[in-house]
Amino acid sequence: MKQELVPALMDIDARIAVKDGHVEKKPHGHGDVHALLHQHGLPAKWAKEGREWLLLFQDTNPLPFRSLCAILGVSVSRGFAMNSVAVPRLPGEAVGGICQLSYGADVNPDQVYQQQEQFIRKGASGDDLTINVEYNQLDPLLKDTPAGGDVADASGFSPYPGNINVLVFHVGTMAQRLATTGGIVPEFVNPKWADAEKSKFKSPTRLECMMQDFPRLCTKARCGKTWMWKVHALAVNPACHSVWL
């Protein structure tokens, strides 16, 4: 499977960036893995072959296999469609936090979606969702709650454990949801700003998507997290950012 690139955007008006006379292109994000799996018919094929579970991981982290047996056991016993490995996370750490998002029947889901574009558009039925919330959105979201922000609990860590993109999927459920949705994960834009007013980009940005947003494709299935330790190594980060681990 090979991921295609998408046109880059040069400004807040979403004008296409051009470089050396050609449209500048950038990766669309690892959320494309779901659409690619579906386009190649792999989850449906695996389900027919009797395969039950799929692990997705990122090769910058060499340690997830330490947790695989435990994660599979939890996934089976809890009947999860997707299970995320979570690790202890410091408040404000540049790692997404896994949360349970919920709101009651008196909340307009369209307003929630517009305010936090990472979140799912759901029926106003009081349903909830266990999903990653990116660190740059987590603290602003929590500031509007009694917690007052992304702060430590008695353990010294954030109550919202870190997402490390070690994801276990039930193959049958995944195949069914991909057949319905095409594996198209909702997109977002995360530009790097050149000014305090947030009117100019430092460099062209692009639409992107994330593989950990799969729960947004299966709102009726059970998705959860399993809190682990010593399953994460920041091989992609500079040593000065990783040494404390």
Question: PLM features: residue spans?
Answer:
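Conserved N-terminal catalytic core of the sugar/cofactor nucleotidyltransferase
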Residues: M1-R51
